[in-house]
């Protein structure tokens, strides 16, 4: 409930007996001629993405129970023969979430469930692997030097290059968008199945739609 207000920075500095920073040679250029904003934006997006990842498997588990799905698609043997890290982790988490579910232990009439349920490890896992890779890219970037030119004092060299170019970040932000879109897509398909009047569930999950 904190209240914020926009104030004149000059007045705030004076209140605290501080003087504005006077930029020296090259410091101004270093602040604007690099990937600082892209990096900050990407890290913010990744923080949000990782928060979302922490919830996706739990939400999916609830959907699996609500739709009375089989748990065979999450058996570790299926994922051991296609050992992608995210896929294995997702299947394991689903089984952990539903370990005490009475619904999951009941006899199932259907032989298989819809893709949106039985392919959760493959879809969620792919997005997890993608986001893990993107995390590594941005970790490297925020610990890198991206201004230009670059001064190498020990070598007594000033070199002009292209480290300011943000192509690496741009491509991986697109990759992040794809990974998140896939999580949203499969979630939407599960939602549709849940409200479509199947498995003895009322249409739209209400008694009088």
Language-model features: where?
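Mobile "lid/hinge" segments at catalytic clefts and subdomain interfaces of large enzymes
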Residues: 1, 5-95
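Short secondary-structure boundary micro-motifs
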Residues: 13-15, 28, 34-35, 123-124, ...
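Glycine/charged-rich beta-loop-alpha catalytic/anionic-binding loops adjacent to active sites
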Residues: 14-23, 153-160, 199-207
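Short, functional N-terminal and low-complexity linear motifs
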Residues: 21-28, 57-64, 101-106, 141-145, ...
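Active-site-adjacent bridging/hinge elements
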Residues: 28-34, 147-155, 194-200
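Charged, low-complexity, helix-prone segments enriched in Lys/Glu/Asp/Gln
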Residues: 45, 49-52, 120-123, 127, ...
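Accessory "access/gating" subregions that flank catalytic or transport cores
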Residues: 64-185
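C-terminal catalytic subdomain
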Residues: 167-209
């Amino acid at each position: 409930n904190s209240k914020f207000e926009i104030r004149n920075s000059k007045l705030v500095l004076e209140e605290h007996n501080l003087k504005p920073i006077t930029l020296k040679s090259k410091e101004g250029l270093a602040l604007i001629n690099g990937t600082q904003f892209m990096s900050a934006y990407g890290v913010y997006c990744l923080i949000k993405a990782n928060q979302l990842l922490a919830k996706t498997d739990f939400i999916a588990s609830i959907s699996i129970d609500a739709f009375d799905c089989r748990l065979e698609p999450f058996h570790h043997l299926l994922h051991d023969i296609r050992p992608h890290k995210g896929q294995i982790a997702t299947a394991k988490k689903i089984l952990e979430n539903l370990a005490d579910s009475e619904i999951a232990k009941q006899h199932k009439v259907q032989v298989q469930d819809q893709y949106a349920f039985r392919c959760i490890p493959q879809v969620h896992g792919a997005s997890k692997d993608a986001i893990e890779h993107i995390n590594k890219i941005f970790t490297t970037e925020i610990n890198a030097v991206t201004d230009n030119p670059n001064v190498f004092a020990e070598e007594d060299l000033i070199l002009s290059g292209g480290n300011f170019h943000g192509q690496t970040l741009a491509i991986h932000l697109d990759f992040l968008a794809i990974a998140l879109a896939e999580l949203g897509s499969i979630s939407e398909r599960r939602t549709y199945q849940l409200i479509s009047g199947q498995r003895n569930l009322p249409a739209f999950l209400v008694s009088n739609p």
